[in-house]
Protein backbone atom coordinates (compact mmCIF):
# COMPACT_ATOMS: atom_id res chain seq x y z
CA UNK A 1 0.00 0.00 0.00
CA UNK A 2 1.49 3.33 -1.09
CA UNK A 3 -0.56 5.52 1.26
CA UNK A 4 0.61 3.92 4.50
CA UNK A 5 2.77 5.43 7.23
CA UNK A 6 3.86 3.78 10.47
CA UNK A 7 4.94 6.07 13.33
CA UNK A 8 6.58 3.30 15.35
CA UNK A 9 10.08 1.82 15.20
CA UNK A 10 9.05 -1.58 16.55
CA UNK A 11 5.79 -3.50 16.16
CA UNK A 12 4.93 -6.82 17.81
CA UNK A 13 4.26 -9.71 15.43
CA UNK A 14 0.58 -10.08 16.36
CA UNK A 15 -0.09 -6.38 15.75
CA UNK A 16 1.71 -6.55 12.40
CA UNK A 17 -0.39 -9.56 11.44
CA UNK A 18 -3.58 -7.67 12.31
CA UNK A 19 -2.47 -4.69 10.21
CA UNK A 20 -1.70 -6.92 7.23
CA UNK A 21 -5.05 -8.71 7.58
CA UNK A 22 -6.93 -5.42 7.43
CA UNK A 23 -4.91 -3.96 4.57
CA UNK A 24 -5.29 -7.14 2.51
CA UNK A 25 -9.05 -6.61 2.25
CA UNK A 26 -10.24 -5.15 -1.06
CA UNK A 27 -12.61 -2.79 0.77
CA UNK A 28 -9.68 -0.90 2.29
CA UNK A 29 -7.01 -1.12 -0.42
CA UNK A 30 -7.29 2.57 -1.45
CA UNK A 31 -7.57 4.02 2.07
CA UNK A 32 -5.17 6.50 3.67
CA UNK A 33 -3.71 4.64 6.65
CA UNK A 34 -1.60 5.86 9.57
CA UNK A 35 -0.33 3.58 12.34
CA UNK A 36 0.19 5.47 15.62
CA UNK A 37 3.25 5.10 17.92
CA UNK A 38 1.18 3.28 20.58
CA UNK A 39 0.38 0.45 18.15
CA UNK A 40 -0.29 -2.94 19.75
CA UNK A 41 -2.45 -6.00 19.18
CA UNK A 42 -6.10 -5.68 20.11
CA UNK A 43 -9.11 -7.96 20.31
CA UNK A 44 -9.90 -8.67 16.67
CA UNK A 45 -8.13 -5.60 15.31
CA UNK A 46 -4.99 -3.61 15.94
CA UNK A 47 -4.89 -0.70 18.38
CA UNK A 48 -3.37 2.51 16.98
CA UNK A 49 -4.86 2.06 13.51
CA UNK A 50 -6.06 5.32 11.96
CA UNK A 51 -7.53 5.55 8.48
CA UNK A 52 -9.89 7.44 6.22
CA UNK A 53 -12.40 4.75 5.24
CA UNK A 54 -14.57 7.13 3.25
CA UNK A 55 -18.26 6.26 3.66
CA UNK A 56 -17.49 3.18 5.75
CA UNK A 57 -16.99 2.77 9.50
CA UNK A 58 -15.84 -0.30 11.44
CA UNK A 59 -17.14 -0.13 15.04
CA UNK A 60 -14.54 -2.66 16.15
CA UNK A 61 -11.73 -0.40 14.93
CA UNK A 62 -13.17 2.55 16.86
CA UNK A 63 -13.19 0.22 19.86
CA UNK A 64 -15.34 -0.63 22.84
CA UNK A 65 -14.31 2.22 25.15
CA UNK A 66 -15.92 4.95 23.06
CA UNK A 67 -14.92 8.42 24.23
CA UNK A 68 -12.00 7.25 26.37
CA UNK A 69 -9.91 10.28 27.25
CA UNK A 70 -8.48 12.48 29.97
CA UNK A 71 -9.78 15.39 32.01
CA UNK A 72 -7.31 17.91 33.44
CA UNK A 73 -8.43 19.98 36.45
CA UNK A 74 -6.21 22.81 37.69
CA UNK A 75 -5.61 22.73 41.45
CA UNK A 76 -3.44 25.84 41.49
CA UNK A 77 -0.47 25.95 43.88
CA UNK A 78 -2.17 23.76 46.46
CA UNK A 79 0.36 21.96 48.63
CA UNK A 80 0.35 18.17 48.47
CA UNK A 81 2.21 16.54 51.34
CA UNK A 82 2.02 12.97 52.65
CA UNK A 83 -1.13 13.74 54.66
CA UNK A 84 -2.90 15.38 51.71
CA UNK A 85 -1.97 12.53 49.36
CA UNK A 86 -3.22 9.96 51.86
CA UNK A 87 -6.49 11.87 52.10
CA UNK A 88 -6.77 11.95 48.30
CA UNK A 89 -6.12 8.21 48.14
CA UNK A 90 -8.78 7.55 50.78
CA UNK A 91 -11.33 9.78 49.01
CA UNK A 92 -10.77 8.05 45.67
CA UNK A 93 -10.99 4.54 47.13
CA UNK A 94 -14.08 5.43 49.17
CA UNK A 95 -16.13 7.50 46.75
CA UNK A 96 -14.99 6.54 43.22
CA UNK A 97 -15.87 2.91 42.37
CA UNK A 98 -13.32 1.10 40.20
CA UNK A 99 -13.13 -2.15 38.28
CA UNK A 100 -16.63 -3.41 37.48
CA UNK A 101 -18.16 -1.63 40.48
CA UNK A 102 -20.69 1.21 40.14
CA UNK A 103 -22.38 3.61 42.55
CA UNK A 104 -25.24 2.35 44.73
CA UNK A 105 -27.33 5.26 43.50
CA UNK A 106 -27.37 7.44 40.42
CA UNK A 107 -25.11 10.51 40.70
CA UNK A 108 -26.82 12.33 37.82
CA UNK A 109 -29.42 11.82 35.13
CA UNK A 110 -28.18 11.21 31.61
CA UNK A 111 -31.30 11.78 29.52
CA UNK A 112 -29.40 11.41 26.23
CA UNK A 113 -29.19 7.68 26.90
CA UNK A 114 -32.75 7.28 25.63
CA UNK A 115 -31.82 9.03 22.38
CA UNK A 116 -29.58 6.14 21.32
CA UNK A 117 -30.86 4.31 18.26
CA UNK A 118 -29.79 1.09 19.97
CA UNK A 119 -31.32 2.01 23.34
CA UNK A 120 -33.76 -0.92 23.35
CA UNK A 121 -30.83 -3.30 22.84
CA UNK A 122 -28.97 -2.14 25.96
CA UNK A 123 -28.83 -4.28 29.08
CA UNK A 124 -29.48 -2.82 32.55
CA UNK A 125 -29.70 0.88 31.66
CA UNK A 126 -30.12 1.80 35.33
CA UNK A 127 -26.72 0.29 36.08
CA UNK A 128 -25.26 2.20 33.13
CA UNK A 129 -26.41 5.49 34.66
CA UNK A 130 -24.97 4.44 38.03
CA UNK A 131 -21.60 3.98 36.33
CA UNK A 132 -21.27 7.74 35.79
CA UNK A 133 -18.59 8.80 38.25
CA UNK A 134 -16.68 5.50 38.19
CA UNK A 135 -13.14 4.75 37.05
CA UNK A 136 -13.29 1.26 35.57
CA UNK A 137 -10.17 -0.85 35.11
CA UNK A 138 -7.39 -1.51 32.61
CA UNK A 139 -5.10 1.47 32.11
CA UNK A 140 -7.55 3.99 33.58
CA UNK A 141 -6.15 6.12 36.38
CA UNK A 142 -6.50 9.17 38.63
CA UNK A 143 -3.34 11.09 39.53
CA UNK A 144 -2.02 14.50 40.54
CA UNK A 145 0.72 15.98 38.36
CA UNK A 146 3.00 18.98 38.86
CA UNK A 147 3.79 21.40 36.01
CA UNK A 148 7.08 23.27 35.62
CA UNK A 149 5.51 26.40 37.13
CA UNK A 150 4.52 24.49 40.26
CA UNK A 151 0.82 24.28 39.43
CA UNK A 152 -0.88 21.02 40.43
CA UNK A 153 -3.32 19.22 38.12
CA UNK A 154 -5.80 16.45 38.80
CA UNK A 155 -5.73 14.07 35.82
CA UNK A 156 -8.57 11.61 35.25
CA UNK A 157 -8.30 8.95 32.54
CA UNK A 158 -11.40 6.86 31.85
CA UNK A 159 -14.15 6.39 29.25
CA UNK A 160 -17.75 5.38 28.65
CA UNK A 161 -17.58 2.26 30.81
CA UNK A 162 -19.90 -0.61 29.81
CA UNK A 163 -22.09 1.67 27.69
CA UNK A 164 -19.36 2.03 25.06
CA UNK A 165 -18.81 -1.72 24.96
CA UNK A 166 -22.49 -2.49 24.53
CA UNK A 167 -22.88 0.06 21.75
CA UNK A 168 -19.71 -1.11 19.97
CA UNK A 169 -20.70 -4.78 20.20
CA UNK A 170 -24.24 -4.10 18.97
CA UNK A 171 -23.09 -2.19 15.89
CA UNK A 172 -20.26 -4.61 15.03
CA UNK A 173 -22.76 -7.48 15.14
CA UNK A 174 -25.12 -5.39 13.02
CA UNK A 175 -22.34 -4.76 10.49
CA UNK A 176 -21.76 -8.51 10.25
CA UNK A 177 -25.48 -9.23 9.82
CA UNK A 178 -25.78 -6.61 7.10
CA UNK A 179 -22.85 -8.10 5.23
CA UNK A 180 -24.56 -11.48 5.53
CA UNK A 181 -27.35 -9.96 3.42
CA UNK A 182 -29.73 -8.93 6.18
CA UNK A 183 -29.91 -5.35 4.90
CA UNK A 184 -32.42 -6.58 2.32
CA UNK A 185 -34.27 -8.51 5.03
CA UNK A 186 -34.53 -5.42 7.25
CA UNK A 187 -35.77 -3.28 4.34
CA UNK A 188 -38.43 -5.87 3.47
CA UNK A 189 -39.40 -6.13 7.13
CA UNK A 190 -39.91 -2.36 7.41
CA UNK A 191 -42.01 -2.36 4.24
CA UNK A 192 -44.06 -5.30 5.51
CA UNK A 193 -44.84 -3.53 8.78
CA UNK A 194 -45.85 -0.33 6.98
CA UNK A 195 -48.03 -2.20 4.46
CA UNK A 196 -49.79 -4.31 7.09
CA UNK A 197 -50.49 -1.27 9.28
CA UNK A 198 -51.90 0.62 6.30
CA UNK A 199 -54.14 -2.36 5.49
CA UNK A 200 -55.40 -2.64 9.07
CA UNK A 201 -53.71 -6.02 9.59
CA UNK A 202 -51.60 -5.23 12.66
CA UNK A 203 -52.49 -8.53 14.34
CA UNK A 204 -50.84 -10.42 11.47
CA UNK A 205 -47.51 -8.56 11.53
CA UNK A 206 -45.71 -10.84 13.99
CA UNK A 207 -46.49 -14.05 12.12
CA UNK A 208 -45.65 -12.41 8.77
CA UNK A 209 -42.24 -11.30 10.08
CA UNK A 210 -41.53 -14.81 11.37
CA UNK A 211 -42.31 -16.21 7.93
CA UNK A 212 -40.10 -13.59 6.29
CA UNK A 213 -37.18 -14.48 8.55
CA UNK A 214 -37.74 -18.20 8.09
CA UNK A 215 -37.28 -17.83 4.35
CA UNK A 216 -34.13 -15.70 4.68
CA UNK A 217 -30.89 -17.24 3.44
CA UNK A 218 -27.67 -15.62 4.66
CA UNK A 219 -24.59 -15.18 2.50
CA UNK A 220 -20.99 -15.52 3.67
CA UNK A 221 -19.26 -12.12 4.06
CA UNK A 222 -15.96 -11.61 2.27
CA UNK A 223 -14.55 -9.92 5.38
CA UNK A 224 -13.72 -11.32 8.84
CA UNK A 225 -16.52 -10.56 11.31
CA UNK A 226 -14.28 -8.17 13.28
CA UNK A 227 -13.68 -6.07 10.13
CA UNK A 228 -17.23 -5.86 8.78
CA UNK A 229 -18.30 -2.25 8.25
CA UNK A 230 -21.38 -0.06 8.24
CA UNK A 231 -22.54 2.21 5.43
CA UNK A 232 -25.49 4.49 4.69
CA UNK A 233 -28.16 4.99 7.35
CA UNK A 234 -26.63 2.40 9.66
CA UNK A 235 -23.31 4.25 9.60
CA UNK A 236 -25.12 7.47 10.50
CA UNK A 237 -26.98 5.76 13.34
CA UNK A 238 -23.71 4.42 14.72
CA UNK A 239 -22.03 7.84 14.52
CA UNK A 240 -25.04 9.39 16.28
CA UNK A 241 -24.84 6.85 19.10
CA UNK A 242 -21.06 7.17 19.27
CA UNK A 243 -21.37 10.92 19.94
CA UNK A 244 -23.74 10.20 22.83
CA UNK A 245 -21.22 7.72 24.24
CA UNK A 246 -18.53 10.40 23.98
CA UNK A 247 -20.70 12.80 25.98
CA UNK A 248 -21.34 10.03 28.52
CA UNK A 249 -17.59 9.46 28.87
CA UNK A 250 -16.95 13.18 29.33
CA UNK A 251 -19.63 13.47 32.01
CA UNK A 252 -18.15 10.42 33.72
CA UNK A 253 -14.81 12.21 34.08
CA UNK A 254 -16.46 15.45 35.20
CA UNK A 255 -18.45 13.60 37.86
CA UNK A 256 -15.31 11.91 39.19
CA UNK A 257 -13.62 15.32 39.46
CA UNK A 258 -16.64 16.78 41.28
CA UNK A 259 -16.75 13.86 43.72
CA UNK A 260 -13.07 14.18 44.56
CA UNK A 261 -13.13 17.98 44.93
CA UNK A 262 -16.26 17.85 47.10
CA UNK A 263 -14.60 15.48 49.58
CA UNK A 264 -11.14 17.05 49.75
Predicted regions, residues:
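Short glycine-rich or small-residue beta-strand-to-loop segments that form or flank ligand, phosphate
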Residues: 34, 153-157
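An anion-binding catalytic pocket shared by soluble metabolic enzymes
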Residues: 41-52, 57-58
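Glycine-rich, flexible loop motifs
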Residues: 1-33, 53-61, 66-149, 165-264
Amino acid sequence: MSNLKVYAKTIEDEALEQINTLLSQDAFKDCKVRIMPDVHAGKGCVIGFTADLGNKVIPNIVGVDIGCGMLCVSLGHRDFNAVTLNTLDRVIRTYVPSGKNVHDGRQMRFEELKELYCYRELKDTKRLERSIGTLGGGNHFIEVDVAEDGYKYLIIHTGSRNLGKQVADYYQNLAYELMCGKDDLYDRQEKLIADYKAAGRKSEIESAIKELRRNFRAVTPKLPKDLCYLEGKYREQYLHDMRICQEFAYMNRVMIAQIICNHM
